[in-house]
Amino acid sequence: MKPGKGYKAMLDEANAEITTLEVPEAIEWHKDPDVLFVDLRDPRELEREGQIPGAFHAPRGMLEFWIDPESPYHKPVFAEDKQFVFYCAGGWRSALAAKLAQDMGIERVAHVEGGFGAWKAAGGPVATVEKKSGGK
């Protein structure tokens, strides 16, 4: 395998180009109806930990397809004129996702430093997520 960029270099690049919110600021943004939080975590993480109330769940592996209006998997929510705030468990996936969304043409993007773990530790609101039936 030819050596390429590692995840650390990719995170450094992303963090240099995107807006990063500390948790207290993110909690304030959560009160704004123009802001949509996007949860990138795996469904099992949501079921185990809960999520930010009102967040839209977009698994990280589907994000490119859900954002692109030309994709058969496009989700109209990503065409809305909203401020998108991405988050994951610890802030790495969300930094990369915010950079990706920005590269794909979404202008108002940010991510939560420290992710859901930091949000929860700071006492941010948390909603319970019901386990989906039919799965293991």
What is each stretch, according to the model?
Residues 1-35, 43-83, 92-136:
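Rhodanese-like catalytic fold shared by cysteine-dependent sulfurtransferases
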Residues 38:
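Active-site flanking residues adjacent to catalytic metal/cofactor-binding acidic residues
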